[in-house]
């Protein structure tokens, strides 16, 4: 069955909780979840909040910081942005089909949208949608933003990605590479885009979508509290002795290492890689081994992107 879930809530922690709840309860169905957050920077599962966002400025101006389950980079949400999430069993997960829904919704408002790179949708050569992905225990979701009429000044002020990441994309600022769809379709609103997304969802999947009732707030409260907690948002800082970082085609990586008696005692990994499991895999591979280049290289070679990681570590001459 196809379902559309909608909410008028604009609290990022409650909305992320609902997203997780839907994933846990999607069953054999495919759900399109449409939602909006008010004045929020949402960072990827493994990102460093202080490196990606001007957190103090965001807080001073009444904004919220949120961290999602999926990997990828930081994005700004306001009520000029429309979020979407496709949720289903792995056997029903079809990225091209899901992207086709977004492209069809854009076509309905006269915009030609194309997929670019690892996770972006472009219109007029500029990004209007960043996408990210999460897979767990046979279920998956694909979610993203749709910039309709977002406050670009705030977007540019709050987001502060590493300089190397921007240089790798050939741009000088976050703002210079994004576009509001309203600029290309002046009568477009978030309300209209929700209608277009629903119509496109039904057209691409070839069946009528039913409206899915949203659970009571009390059911979502424990998950919402997790997403709002300082532990989830910021983690526990470690007294690191060594910082290693590099920019790859698959994302930016920063590794903080705490060494005690010549042995790696703790590791913190920050990355915007789309593979949300990479950070924990890398951390697990490094903790407990001698702090020597050859040992580190040996430990990472079997991991995803192992050769890239090995080359980064060899270059450190530890």
Explain the meaning of each model-derived region.
Residues 220-261:
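Acidic, Ser/Thr-rich low-complexity intrinsically disordered segments
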Residues 1-93:
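N-terminal lobe of the biotin/lipoate ligase/transferase fold
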Residues 102, 110, 129, 137-237, ...:
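Long, positively charged amphipathic alpha-helical accessory segments at protein N-termini or as interdomain linkers
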Residues 36-41, 114-125:
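Short, glycine/charge-rich beta-strand/loop segments that flank catalytic centers
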Residues 81-119:
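Contiguous, small/hydrophobic- and glycine-enriched helical/loop subdomains that border
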């Amino acid at each position: 069955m196809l379902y559309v879930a909608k909410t008028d809530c604009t609290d990022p922690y409650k909305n992320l909780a609902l997203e997780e709840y839907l994933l846990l309860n999607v069953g054999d169905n495919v759900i399109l979840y449409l939602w909006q957050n008010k004045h929020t920077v949402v960072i990827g599962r493994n990102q460093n909040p202080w490196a990606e966002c001007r957190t103090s400025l965001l807080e001073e101006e009444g904004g919220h910081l949120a961290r999602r389950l999926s990997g990828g980079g930081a994005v700004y949400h306001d009520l000029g942005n429309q979020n979407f999430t496709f949720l289903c069993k792995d056997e029903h997960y079809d990225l091209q089909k899901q992207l086709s829904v977004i492209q069809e919704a854009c076509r309905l408002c006269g915009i030609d949208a194309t997929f670019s790179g690892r996770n972006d949708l472009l219109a007029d050569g500029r990004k209007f949608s960043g996408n990210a992905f999460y897979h767990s225990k046979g279920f998956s979701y694909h979610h993203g933003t749709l910039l309709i009429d977002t406050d670009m000044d705030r977007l540019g002020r709050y987001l502060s990605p590493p300089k190397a990441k921007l240089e790798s994309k050939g741009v000088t600022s976050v703002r210079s590479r994004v576009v509001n769809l309203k600029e290309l379709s002046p009568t477009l609103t978030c309300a209209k885009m929700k209608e277009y997304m629903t119509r496109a969802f039904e057209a691409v999947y070839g069946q009528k979508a039913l409206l899915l009732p949203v659970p009571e707030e009390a059911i979502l409260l424990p998950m919402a509290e997790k997403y709002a907690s300082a532990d989830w948002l910021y983690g526990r800082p470690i007294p690191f002795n060594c910082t290693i970082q590099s920019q790859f085609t698959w994302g930016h990586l920063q590794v903080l290492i705490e060494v005690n008696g010549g042995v790696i005692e703790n590791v913190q990994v920050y990355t915007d890689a789309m593979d949300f499991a990479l950070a924990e895999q890398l951390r697990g591979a490094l903790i407990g081994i001698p702090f020597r280049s050859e040992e580190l290289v040996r430990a990472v070679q079997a991991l995803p992107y192992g050769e890239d990681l090995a080359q980064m570590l060899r270059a450190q001459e530890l």
